[in-house]
Amino acid sequence: MKDENSINFLSSNESYLYDKSENELRPKVFEDFKGQVNVKETLSIFIRASKERGEALDHVFLSGPPGLGKTTLASIIAFEMNASIKITSAPAFDKPKDIIGILTGLDEKSILFIDEIHRLRPIIEEMLCIAMEDYELDWVIGQGANARTVRMPLPKFTLIGATTKPGKVTSPLYARFGITARFELYSEIELVEIIKRNSIILNIEIEEDAAFLLARSSRGTPRIANRLLRRIRDIAQVTGSLVVTSDIVSIGLEMLRIDGEGLDEQDRNILRSLILKFNGGPVGVDTLAISVGETADSLEDFYEPYLIMKGFINRTHRGRKATEFAYLHLNLEMKEEDISENQRVSF
C-alpha cells in the first residue's frame, strides 16, 4: 500500500473540488465535521465494521446540493479507513483508457472519489459497473478478427460517487452502491458551529450575534459560510476592528448585496422575474432560467433548493410558482387571484 491518507488529484481540472485556499478550513475527522448527523452516524458504523473485518468499505453514493461537504466527507472516510484517496470528476474520463489507467493504479482498500458521477459517458459507466461488482476489467485489444479480450484483476477498492443530480444516475450504476447518503442544507445552529470553528483557524474573534447573522446569510451551505467569513475578516482588518461584531457583518453583507434572508441579487432577480414577467407563475424551469441568464441546471442545483427551503418558491407539476412570502419580501402587491391560487397550492 502507498502512503496512507494521501490525497491524489488526478488533473488540474479538480481544483474546483478541493480549493487549496479552503483546505485549512476542511475538517479532517468526523468529530470536526459539523452537521449531517445521520450521514456521519451511519458511515461510522459501516467504517468500523469494515475495519474490524479487514475489508474495503462498500461503495458509497453521496448526493445533495453543492457546497455541503461531499468531497470533504470522502477525504474523512479515507482518513478513518487509513486508506489513500484519488479525487477526480466524471468529465475527466474521456476515453476507456482513462478509467483503466486509474483503476489499475489503485491500491488494495484505497478509495476513488468521482464527483459529478451522473456525467459519466455510457461506455465508461459500463466499465465502472463491472469493476465495482467483479473487481475486474475487460479490455478489448486489437480490431476485427484479431481482436481479443483481456481480463485484468483489480484490487478491492471503494468508489465514492457524488452528485447534485441523483435522478440522472442510471439504475445499473446506482445499484452498485452499497451505501447511500443524502446531504441536506445545514441549520443555522450547525453553521454557527462551523463559523466559530473556522474563525479560530483563521485567527478571528467573532461575537455570538455576528456568527448567527453570518450563518443566517449562508444559504444553509458551509462553502458559502466560509467564503463570507473570509470577506468579513477583510472588512474587520481594513476597519481596524479586532473583533467581528454584528455591525461589521451587516456592513459586509450590504456590500455583497445579501439581504436578511440570505438572498443575493440573483436570488431576487429570479423572484422578480417569476412575479413580474410570469405573473407569479407557474412557469417552466427552462423558461425561468433563460429569463435571468442562468442555465436550468444552475437554477435547479444552486438557487432553487434554498428558495424552496425558505418558502419563496413552490415547485408544482405545472412549473415554479412564487409564494406570498416572495411578494412580501420584494414589497410587491399580490393579486387577489394569486392569493387564492397560492392558498390552494399550499393546501
UniProtKB/Swiss-Prot annotation:
User: Region annotation Head domain (RuvB-H): residue ranges?
Assistant: 260-347
- Outline the segment boundaries, as ranges, of region: Large ATPase domain (RuvB-L): 1-186
Domain of life, per lineage: Bacteria
Q: Catalysed reaction per UniProt?
A: ATP + H2O = ADP + phosphate + H(+)
Q: Where in the cell is it found?
A: Cytoplasm
Q: Quote the record's binding site residues for ATP.
A: L25, R26, G67, K70, T71, T72, E133, D134, Y135, R176, Y186, R223
Q: Where are the stretches annotated Small ATPAse domain (RuvB-S)? A: 187-257
Disulfide pairings: none
Q: Which Pfam families match?
A: AAA_lid_4 (PF17864), RuvB_C (PF05491), RuvB_N (PF05496)
* InterPro entries from the UniProt entry: AAA+_ATPase (IPR003593), AAA_lid_4 (IPR041445), DNA_helicase_Holl-junc_RuvB (IPR004605), P-loop_NTPase (IPR027417), RuvB-like_N (IPR008824), RuvB_C (IPR008823), WH-like_DNA-bd_sf (IPR036388), WH_DNA-bd_sf (IPR036390)
Q: Where does Mg(2+) bind?
A: T71
The GO annotation for biological process reads: DNA recombination; DNA repair
Ordered alphabetically, the record's keywords are: ATP-binding, Cytoplasm, DNA damage, DNA recombination, DNA repair, DNA-binding, Hydrolase, Nucleotide-binding
What is the protein's known function?
The RuvA-RuvB-RuvC complex processes Holliday junction (HJ) DNA during genetic recombination and DNA repair, while the RuvA-RuvB complex plays an important role in the rescue of blocked DNA replication forks via replication fork reversal (RFR). RuvA specifically binds to HJ cruciform DNA, conferring on it an open structure. The RuvB hexamer acts as an ATP-dependent pump, pulling dsDNA into and through the RuvAB complex. RuvB forms 2 homohexamers on either side of HJ DNA bound by 1 or 2 RuvA tetramers; 4 subunits per hexamer contact DNA at a time.
Membership in a protein family: Belongs to the RuvB family.
Name the chain's protein.
Holliday junction branch migration complex subunit RuvB
The beginning of the lineage is: Bacteria, Pseudomonadati, Spirochaetota, Spirochaetia, Spirochaetales
